[in-house]
Regions:
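Non-ligating segments of multi-cofactor redox enzymes
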Residues: 1-202
């Protein structure tokens, strides 16, 4: 009888410890994701907490990027994320290279491109990453204010993500990868397009 009680107690404490640990991880993840609203990760990055744990700060992805748009986060963002890879969507954007050199360079698999069922079956169907969210700012976008523009037309590499109606652009958020190329092409001042982190609540 005593053995049964001891066994039940041990099981209870194991469950309690497991739940406590799970709660700690969830809180840490929530805090990290709140901070992650201030940056964008390179293509095919793991979820933020997994990325932080996997990224070795080797800088190989940045070296491999032919467009020099990957950079290490500065220490001002916190020691836990310092030197981890981030994407400069404000001054260049991800060109989504066909061979994904940054992903290939990541031996730690912090950047890991999934293989679709179609690709697995030998079909040439591209898999697009989800890096950020892009949106049209109608108050600043020139065609919404009167004059014609079209500067961003043709900038988007994903079919159907950036479309035009009556010469006014719109973004299909379900298709958009958040690469930032439309933002780079925008000639309005201030910019008529905004690109924000997936973790930013708006």
């Amino acid at each position: 009888m005593v053995d049964e009680i001891d066994h039940s107690r041990r099981a209870f404490f194991r469950r309690a410890a497991g739940k406590a640990a799970e709660h700690v991880v969830e809180e840490a993840q929530a805090r990290l994701e709140s901070r992650a609203a201030h940056w964008v990760r390179p293509p095919f990055s793991l979820p933020e907490l997994e990325f932080i744990l996997a990224c070795t700060r080797c800088d190989e992805c940045a070296t491999a990027c032919p467009h020099n748009v990957i950079f290490p986060l500065p220490a001002s963002y916190g020691a836990d994320v310092a030197a981890t890879a981030a994407l400069d969507v404000l001054n260049g954007g991800c060109h989504m290279c066909e061979d994904w050199p940054c992903v290939t360079a990541c031996e730690a698999d912090a950047l890991k491109r999934p293989v679709s069922e179609e690709e697995d079956e030998g079909q040439d169907v591209p898999v697009w990453p989800k890096m950020a969210r892009a949106m049209i700012l109608a108050d600043d976008c020139l065609p919404y204010r009167g004059p014609e523009c079209g500067a961003c037309q043709g900038s988007c590499p994903i079919p159907g993500a950036l479309t035009f109606s009556m010469e006014k652009p719109s973004i299909d958020t379900a298709r958009c990868a958040g690469c930032g190329l439309c933002l780079a092409a925008c000639i309005a001042d201030p910019k008529g397009i905004r690109v924000i982190s997936l973790y930013r609540q708006e």
